[in-house]
């Protein structure tokens, strides 16, 4: 057998082993979730509730201490707040779901204001890409649970605040137990399935839900399920198509925008707890960070035939929200599978077999991302230009060569698959492939010095 054939066989076997391992990991994760769901359904309720699922034990305080008076003096002198407002806050419990760009400032201001008990829900770990907006985390806590990292920072700010960490994802089988013991819930997540899950659970448990979102330079804020106001399903009875949803990991966000919305989520929670001001129920606050303009608009009232919060709801228990929305309940990379493996290239195959030969390498990321980092000889043609064929004039001569391999790359190997499908329809006789895993795979498998963002 020739050396080249041996190399090809070894590469193919490595690829098959990697695919089998990935499939095994996926099956094992599914089995763990099924085991968890089965054990939850068959065990008595008191056994199901573990340490981080138990309702917070909030002591009832009837007066302020000298430390309270000194610490909170600037808000105690507010006529609409006063001693009674501070006591309500001290006796309250707030659940913050998501300790990211929104949850960090929200938790910080609630702890600083004297909220008696905070629950922190986040399954994720701290990483460097968090620091520009997730202000409770620090360099020395990289790899730590975000909930635990936030707890450390909050206790440094206010050691009198009781903090309970729920370092797990919310699922239909655990959400009710976690949420039940809190007075107010803050939705600081970045995905649609969790928004539906939180809204439905809060309706069932009669909890106000303070919902915030931020993307690029814009932010939004409202309060659901409060004072006979609408729930999330009243406004969005049908989830958006998955391809229309962008999170901050893909679309980007300015840290000060998440800070603005997160701080205002804390403000709305305080207003709900204390009973002061005009709560943003039935209204949507829209923040345009580019112009510095806040707008306040009316949203539709409670829907009489809402499947969740109407007098005769069709939904009486929590459902599979990932299936309902057609997307994952996480902002982590969820690889698309538009092409089969043999229609694509691993980064190792590209480096060994194609990179040194004449070929056309097209990077389909937006120009702003291309400027951050790029592979040698890559040509930037954003996906939108691929789809509208505006790239044809730029690359016409190269595309006329049917023998010239065309390789497409993006950040994670998702958009490049869409581009491959489009180019194959346009140039059916050309060799067109994309890089599996994109630039992230290049860093992980070929060049560790190549930056990840």
Curated annotation (Swiss-Prot):
Disruption phenotype: RNAi-mediated knockdown results in reduced levels of urmylation and increased resistance to oxidative stress. RNAi-mediated knockdown disrupts the circadian rhythm resulting in flies with arrhythmic activity when exposed to constant darkness. It catalyses: [molybdopterin-synthase sulfur-carrier protein]-C-terminal Gly-Gly + ATP + H(+) = [molybdopterin-synthase sulfur-carrier protein]-C-terminal Gly-Gly-AMP + diphosphate; [molybdopterin-synthase sulfur-carrier protein]-C-terminal Gly-Gly-AMP + S-sulfanyl-L-cysteinyl-[cysteine desulfurase] + AH2 = [molybdopterin-synthase sulfur-carrier protein]-C-terminal-Gly-aminoethanethioate + L-cysteinyl-[cysteine desulfurase] + A + AMP + 2 H(+). GO terms for biological process: Mo-molybdopterin cofactor biosynthetic process; molybdopterin cofactor biosynthetic process; protein urmylation; tRNA thio-modification; tRNA wobble position uridine thiolation. InterPro entries: MOCS3/Uba4, Rhodanese-like_dom, Rhodanese-like_dom_sf, ThiF/MoeB/HesA, ThiF_NAD_FAD-bd, Ubiquitin-activating_enz. GO terms for cellular component: cytoplasm; cytosol; molybdopterin adenylyltransferase complex. Its cofactor is Zn(2+). The active site is at residues 248, 410. GO terms for molecular function: ATP binding; metal ion binding; molybdopterin-synthase adenylyltransferase activity; molybdopterin-synthase sulfurtransferase activity; nucleotidyltransferase activity; thiosulfate-cyanide sulfurtransferase activity; URM1 activating enzyme activity. Its EC number is 2.7.7.80, 2.8.1.11. Pathway: tRNA modification; 5-methoxycarbonylmethyl-2-thiouridine-tRNA biosynthesis; Cofactor biosynthesis; molybdopterin biosynthesis. Its main location: cytoplasm. The keyword Magnesium does not apply. It is found in: Cytoplasm, Cytosol. ATP binds at residues 101, 122, 129-133, 146, 190-191. PANTHER family: ADENYLYLTRANSFERASE AND SULFURTRANSFERASE MOCS3, UBIQUITIN-ACTIVATING ENZYME E1. Plays a central role in 2-thiolation of mcm(5)S(2)U at tRNA wobble positions of cytosolic tRNA(Lys), tRNA(Glu) and tRNA(Gln). Also essential during biosynthesis of the molybdenum cofactor. Acts by mediating the C-terminal thiocarboxylation of sulfur carriers URM1 and MOCS2A. Its N-terminus first activates URM1 and MOCS2A as acyl-adenylates (-COAMP), then the persulfide sulfur on the catalytic cysteine is transferred to URM1 and MOCS2A to form thiocarboxylation (-COSH) of their C-terminus. This is Adenylyltransferase and sulfurtransferase MOCS3. The lineage of its organism: Eukaryota, Metazoa, Ecdysozoa, Arthropoda, Hexapoda.
């Amino acid at each position: 057998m020739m050396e080249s054939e041996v190399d090809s066989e070894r590469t193919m076997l490595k690829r098959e082993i990697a695919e089998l391992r990935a499939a095994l990991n996926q099956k094992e994760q599914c089995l763990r979730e099924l085991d968890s769901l089965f054990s939850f359904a068959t065990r008595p309720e008191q056994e199901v509730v573990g340490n981080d699922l138990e309702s917070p034990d909030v002591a009832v305080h009837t007066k302020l201490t000298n430390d309270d008076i000194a610490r909170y003096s600037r808000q105690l002198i507010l006529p609409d707040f006063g001693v009674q407002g501070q006591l309500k806050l001290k006796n309250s419990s707030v659940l913050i779901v998501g300790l990211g760009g929104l949850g960090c400032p929200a938790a910080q201001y609630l702890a600083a204001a004297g909220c008696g008990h905070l629950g922190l829900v986040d399954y994720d770990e701290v990483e460097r890409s968090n620091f520009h907006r997730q202000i409770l985390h620090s360099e020395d806590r990289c790899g730590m649970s975000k909930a635990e990292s936030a707890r450390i920072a909050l206790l440094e700010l206010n050691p009198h605040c009781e903090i309970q960490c729920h370092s797990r994802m919310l699922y239909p089988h655990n959400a009710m137990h976690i949420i039940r013991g809190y007075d107010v819930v803050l939705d600081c997540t970045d995905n649609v399935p969790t928004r539906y899950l939180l809204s439905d659970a809060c309706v069932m448990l009669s909890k106000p839900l303070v919902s915030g979102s931020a993307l690029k330079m814009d932010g939004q804020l409202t309060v659901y399920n409060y004072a006979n106001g609408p729930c999330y399903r009243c406004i969005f009875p049908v989830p958006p198509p998955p391809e229309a949803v962008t999170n901050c990991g893909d679309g980007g966000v300015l840290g000060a925008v998440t800070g603005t919305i997160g701080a205002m989520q804390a403000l709305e929670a305080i207003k709900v707890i204390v009973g002061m001001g005009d709560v943003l129920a039935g209204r949507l606050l829209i923040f345009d960070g580019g112009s510095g303009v806040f707008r306040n608009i009316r949203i539709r009232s409670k829907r009489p035939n809402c499947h969740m919060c109407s007098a005769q709801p069709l939904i009486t228990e929590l459902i599979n929200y990932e299936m309902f929305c057609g997307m994952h309940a996480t902002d982590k990379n969820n690889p698309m599978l538009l092409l089969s493996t043999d229609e694509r290239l691993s980064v190792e195959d590209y480096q060994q077999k194609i990179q040194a030969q004449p070929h056309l390498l097209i990077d389909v990321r937006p120009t702003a991302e291309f400027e951050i980092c790029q592979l040698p000889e890559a040509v930037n043609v954003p996906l939108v230009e691929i789809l509208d064929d505006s790239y044809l004039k730029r690359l016409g001569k190269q595309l006329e060569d049917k023998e010239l391999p065309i390789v497409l790359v993006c950040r994670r190997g998702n958009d490049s698959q869409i581009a491959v499908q489009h180019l194959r329809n346009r140039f059916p006789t050309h060799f067109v492939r994309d890089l599996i895993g994109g630039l992230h795979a290049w860093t992980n498998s070929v060049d560790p010095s190549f930056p990840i963002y």
